[in-house]
Amino acid sequence: MKRSSLVDSCSYSRIFRSIFCLLSFCIFFLTTTNAQVMHRRLWPWPLWPRPYPQPWPMNPPTPDPSPKPVAPPGPSSKPVAPPGPSPCPSPPPKPQPKPPPAPSPSPCPSPPPKPQPKPVPPPACPPTPPKPQPKPAPPPEPKPAPPPAPKPVPCPSPPKPPAPTPKPVPPHGPPPKPAPAPTPAPSPKPAPSPPKPENKTIPAVFFFGDSVFDTGNNNNLETKIKSNYRPYGMDFKFRVATGRFSNGMVASDYLAKYMGVKEIVPAYLDPKIQPNDLLTGVSFASGGAGYNPTTSEAANAIPMLDQLTYFQDYIEKVNRLVRQEKSQYKLAGLEKTNQLISKGVAIVVGGSNDLIITYFGSGAQRLKNDIDSYTTIIADSAASFVLQLYGYGARRIGVIGTPPLGCVPSQRLKKKKICNEELNYASQLFNSKLLLILGQLSKTLPNSTFVYMDIYTIISQMLETPAAYGFEETKKPCCKTGLLSAGALCKKSTSKICPNTSSYLFWDGVHPTQRAYKTINKVLIKEYLHVLSK
């Protein structure tokens, strides 16, 4: 009886254990299944491992039926947990770009890495998870986009601290080596001025007239109008008095030089003249000459008509010279001589001595003619001389008028040293008539050029504004003949020379200084050379 009751109690206990285990298993199974179902409704990702505890939202979002991309394996596929809990579900991780291949080992030190941009905090609660890109490759470029890595450069120098205005350096390439400071080159010596081009339009130049163009023709004449002694020529080449009426070069020298023909014009009557000098032109002028024959006779100078005779003799000499077979100038005889004369430039100056010496210096002409009729006679004589030059073959002829003669030192009024306006009026009257006659000749004679060259205006401007031309003294001559008066020419023994010849406009009582001649003829060449060289 006892044994059967014991057996029954054991059986019941086994039954209860079995039932208890079955119930426990059912409860555990139901509990686990319901929990997974509920979690999948509220959390679309696998239950385990849970990234971080999330509170259940009041309105669970509807899962997106589109297929979810599978994150590539690797450490970069897992989403990185933010520093703290957020009320929004974290978006799916974006596929990260593949890391670049490891660079080959190089003996050069690698540049320091650039600091990475800070992570941007997640946006506030999107209603739906962001859709991934349909094509995971290529990954979106981060901002700012780094420039492409340049080719490796061997052994760069380490990066220097940033300068105030740094240049952009590639992130993976070596910084460029700084250029060495250039060594300052020694200052070069000023190059010598290039030689002047040879003149090809004017083969020769011929000068006629008075002392403005005389380069020594009066030296062998029996005349008092000479300048072949000191102090004349004190600033000339080799400081030699050559018979030029100035302290150096005169107008004929500068005109020939600026035309590109020759540096110095020889006198035709110079006994030392060379045949080669004849081919480029000479001077026939004589100090004291004038258009009026009476003027040259009074000064015992070479009259203007005699200068034409010398010009004819010159043409014959040149013709004989070019016919010589052994001459270095292989010209074609007379035809080439005619071309030399026609292409050359003939320049005439006169009228000053006709007014100063013949009209205002003596009373004979003033008794016969008034100033108007006398200037007409002188202008007609100038036109006759030009016509005879044309007859000898000259086709390019320039005629220089008279300067303001009343303002030269020897003709100023003695007491106040002011200009003689009566003499200036006579100069202007003669110049106006000369200009009119030359204009008529240009229209009448074919294939010719007649140019009136105005020096009255140039010298008047130099007298009015001497500082603009670099002159200080315009009333007194540099070469004086006495304490209170200025003679026409410098004397050999009694003349006193000014300390600075370049600051004086006039050298003696009539003629300009070398610097004044240079200034005057520069203006003449600038204004009239393009007409004469046509």
UniProtKB/Swiss-Prot annotation:
Segments crossing the lipid bilayer: none
GO BP of this protein: lipid metabolic process
Signal peptide span: 1-35
Keyword Signal: yes
Pro residues bias spans: 59-196
Tissue localization of expression: Found in sporophytic and gametophytic cell types in the anther, only in male fertile plants.
InterPro entries: GDSL, GDSL_lipolytic_enzyme, Lipase_GDSL_AS, Pistil_extensin, SGNH_hydro_sf, SGNH_plant_lipase-like
Region named Disordered: 59-202
Active site: S211, D508, H511
CDD domains assigned: SGNH_plant_lipase_like (cd01837)
UniProt key word Cell membrane: no
Keywords: Signal
An example molecular function term from Gene Ontology annotations: lipase activity
Record-stated family: Belongs to the 'GDSL' lipolytic enzyme family.
Name the UniProt record assigns to this protein: Anther-specific proline-rich protein APG
Organism name: Arabidopsis thaliana
